[in-house]
Each structure stands twice: as C-alpha cells, then as structure tokens.
Amino acid sequence: MNIVATLNKNVAFFYWLQTVSKWDNSYAFEYPLFTYYRHVIQPADEPILSQVRAIIQSDSNPYDILRKLYSEKFDNKNLRLIAHISAPLMDRFDSIWQDCHENLVMWRNAINDFSYDDLYPQLQKIAVFLGLDRQAVQDSTVFLLPPRPEASGPAGHKISSSNFILLRPHYSFNDQKKEAVRIVILHEYAHGLIQQSKLFQEAGRSSYEKFILPKKLVSPPGYTWRSVYNELLAYCIASRTIGGGYLSPQLTGKPRSTVNDMRPSFDRLLAKRKPTLNQIINWASLHMLPKLTDYIEEGKLIDTAIFEPAIKVVDELLS
C-alpha cells in the first residue's frame, strides 16, 4: 500500500473554482477559506461564478461533478461548459497557486517520505470490520491544494467513488506539523473505506431508527444524520482532536486516548464556550473507541452497538 502526494494545478484550480462559486451549503463549506480564495475575484468574474454555481447546484449528484472535474473527465456538456467558461479565471487563481507553490512542493516531498508499512495491517483489519475484503486497502493519490495563510491546521476531503484524497496542508512547512497532516490523510482514507461499506450503511440506518427517529432529533445545521455517522466513525479511526483515534499507536507513537484522558480539556472548553459541531462529533467519537477497538481486534463486524455511546453524547450536547 502506498499513498502518493502530487501537485496538479488543474485539480487545485477546480477546487478553488467550486469554493468561490459558493454552491455548497453543507458543513463542508468553510467561510474563511472562501474569503481567502475570493480575494482575487473581480466584479467582471461574477457572471461566470453564477453560472458555475447554477450548473453544480442543478445536478442530482453535485459531488460527482466535482469528482469528474478533479479527474479531468469532461464527459458531458455541463462539465465541458464549466471547463470552457472558467478558463479565463485561471489567471486569477495563478496568484494564489504561486503564493503557496514552494511550500506545497515541500509538503509533497514530506508526504511521499511517509511510510505506511505499519498502517497497512491495521487498515486491513478496519476493512474486515466494515465487511470489506482486505484488498479494499489500495494505493491512493493525494492532491495538494492551496491552504489559507491563517488556517489553524490541515483539512481534507474524500469524494465517494474517487481514488484520490484532496488535502490542504498547513500553509507553512515544518517537521512538527507532519504528524497532523498524516492523521488527516488517514482520516480521509478511512472515509474512503466507510463509503464502500454496506454494513456501515445498515448499522447507521438501524442506529438512526433506534436512537434518532423516535426522538425526532433534527440533524445539526449543514449536516445530514448520515454525514454525522460517517464523521463519527472516521474520527474514531483517525483524529487530531482526540489524540489520534484507533490508529494513534501508528500515527503518533502514543497509546489511544480515553474519555478520562480527554475529559479535563473538554470540560475546560465547555466552561469557556459552546463547542463547535466538529468538536462535539470528535468528543462523541472518543466514546466509541473502546468498543470499536474490541470489534476490530477480535475480527467482529460493525453493527448498531458501535454507535450507541457516541449518539448518546451527541443527543446530550445538541439537545
């Protein structure tokens, strides 16, 4: 198994384009990134962005449009239209690309020096837990994207049915930040396995019907309950916020954190302000970790019980 980082200006351009078009109202939309990416836009560009936004929003599967744009598969008229009308904006994007290019090259080289030998058997166990064949653990490509200068940490995306990960690393490069980037890559890799799992869908649906539906709980703003379940499991596997997650021994060289380990810091957060949805989901995912670890190490398959500890926490903190 290998994960290879690469620089592809066209992929980065289409990621920038979909961000500045502001088509997405889900939790994946990041306003600070939108503001930074958009500072190069001129008033004359607005009709192009409006048209791009309309095309993406009108599609029954917007993320499939993005997947094909990033894969440079312009196999229908809407994809070809986006590529054609957006071409004049490449000059706008170029200043952002040039600003971060040197650091992205350093990140590419650092990521490609990572070893995944110790992670491969663990990922195979996760695949089995999800009801997948061990061969589901395959090579992947990481496309590096321009980060905003003030970003507090790396961020990634994994589009269903794709064989690549989109990654915005830290704006600046140093050795101390490598661990955080590696965790984000494995978090997104976990999403890729989860997206393939019918057992995950069945377990999540059963948990929803048992714990969410009877209480008529409304999903958090920008989320569907399916995306909440997806993030709970992916964070439980790999997360910067909760000390690494299930893969912590391989990613950080440290034991997996427990609820008792992390409770003081979460209590301090609660005393200061209301946690963000991302923090709540991370905290809730930590409550799943003991059961998830037992299931994976014992070769058991995912079921409804995996989610019960986390959903109770989500219910308490969102109610």
Predicted feature locations:
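Auxiliary, metal-adjacent structural segments of Zn-dependent hydrolase domains
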Residues: 99-161
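An active-site-proximal "capping" alpha-helix that borders the catalytic cofactor pocket
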Residues: 126-129, 228-243
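Acidic, His- and aromatic-enriched active-site or binding-groove loops in soluble protein domains
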Residues: 158-177
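Active-site recognition of the HExxH zinc-binding catalytic motif
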Residues: 179-199
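Pan-zinc metallopeptidase signature
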Residues: 246-319
